Amino acid sequence: MRLMGFDVGSRTVGIAVSDLFGWTAQGVEIIRINEDESEFGLDRVKELVAQHQVTGFVLGLPKNMNNSIGPRAVKAQEYGAMLTELFPEIPVDYIDERLTTVQAERMLVEQADTSRKKRKQVIDKLAAVMILQNYLDAKGPLTKQGY
């Protein structure tokens, strides 16, 4: 089993993958996207899926604080639908990722004393790691299916 985690933003998608045992998540890279021009980095995702032999996708779902689905969560679901269309054999699941990017930024400031410029370069990848690690720790459905 190897899961791939996604932090889908409006300009970038952070990517993380799990180890083969589903215990830990590691950051892979940040893919630049352009929603206005329908460029979603799916060619690069395809390469990463083959490289890492991915068996499941986990996308962060940025719900509103009142648990409703806002525009960014809809965009994450649309990205998940594109993944399903491109990889029909690979299941997609979602996990609530409220405040994950805020947590990631706080971690970079407080623990790594990282400059603003450096934070912008790694924040989405770290958020993807946190999304996937939270999913692994919660033993989400894809961890139990033998994917």
From Swiss-Prot:
It is found in: Cytoplasm. GO terms for cellular component: cytosol. The keyword Cytoplasm applies. It is an enzyme of class 3 (hydrolase). Gene3D superfamilies: YqgF/RNase H-like domain. GO terms for molecular function: nuclease activity. Keywords: Cytoplasm, Hydrolase, Nuclease, Ribosome biogenesis. SUPFAM superfamilies: Ribonuclease H-like (SSF53098). Could be a nuclease involved in processing of the 5'-end of pre-16S rRNA. This is Putative pre-16S rRNA nuclease. It comes from Latilactobacillus sakei subsp. sakei (strain 23K) (Lactobacillus sakei subsp. sakei). The lineage of its organism: Bacteria, Bacillati, Bacillota, Bacilli, Lactobacillales.
